[in-house]
Amino acid sequence: LEHIRLEIIRQDRIISLWQPRLADMRRNATLYVRASSFCNKDILGPKFFKTQLETLDMDEFLTSICAIRHKEVINKFFANYNKEKHQYADSYIYESILRLDLREHFLLTARYLKHYNKRDELLVGYDPGHFSSLVVGQEKEYGRQLRIIKEFYCCYPDEQPELARQFYEFFGADSLNKRIILYPDRAGNKRREELEQITTDSRALKRELESYGFEVELMNEGQATVYHWQQFKLLLLMFGGRSNALPEILIDENECRNLCSAIMLSPLKKTEGRIELDKSSEKKVPLKNQAGLTTQLPSALIYLLFGRYGNKVLSELSSMPDNLPDNLAI
């Protein structure tokens, strides 16, 4: 018994030694837990998993049930995209954040972004729909670099008012330059009703942002049709560093983590010689899970890039390549 008593005293000393250090670590750390449906295997039973395997395709089964998903498709629409080269992790001004008392309410806003300039205008790509998304960037080094610094999204029934609210909460109080250049879908292949809806959505977002004091210039209205091969080729040029007329692109992997994930999962599809961005994931994945798993956020990025830089390499994009005939408009 004496041996047990002494061992308890020894263990208590070890605990008292480490408790302050562990408490300090907890205040500056995040607990990450990853779990799958197999945690409840005893309750759900084998029949549940058999039914799900028969009902879902393999990608959905691995993602939804097993918490396993593809990290990258083989044939990417963003062919030259390299996360080591085109993503950055030094997102925040940590000196400012660490001075705060994190026990009090803390809201991460643009003022804590290392690469945000409150005096520069914001470039915004917008993909409307039941899943609506914004991708926000700023040009650096006199236009030689484009940094994508933030993503926003919402799902139906939330629409433009919710996107504008999120945008204002993040940028509103910190921005001196209130100018936004908004690049929505060019909608080359849309029916007239769809085109009118996109125009309506874009103008509604413009109105909501302006209600918060931003000055919004709406681009892309009435411009020429954009084809899949043109977008694909522009992305090849931009992410491949093949043109001095185009900026280097860097994406914040902390504030745009869904965009970074979804770019790697955006497949190129060829049908009878036609090249397309395969958007089938937008129909397969539930709305609430689409941010990092579908082509929604990458589409918003494409609208921004083509709207902003397509005219800079017009000669490269004005003639259809011989090996990509009869491509579809989007």
Model-predicted segments: where are they?
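Short, conserved catalytic or adaptor-binding loops enriched in Gly and charged residues
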Residues: 10-28, 84-106, 208-210, 238-243
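ATPase catalytic-site recognition across NTP-hydrolyzing enzymes
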Residues: 36-125
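A short acidic Gly-Thr/Ser loop motif
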Residues: 126-131
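Short beta-strand scaffold segments in enzyme catalytic cores
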Residues: 132-138
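Acidic two-metal-ion nuclease catalytic site recognized across multiple nuclease folds
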Residues: 305-330
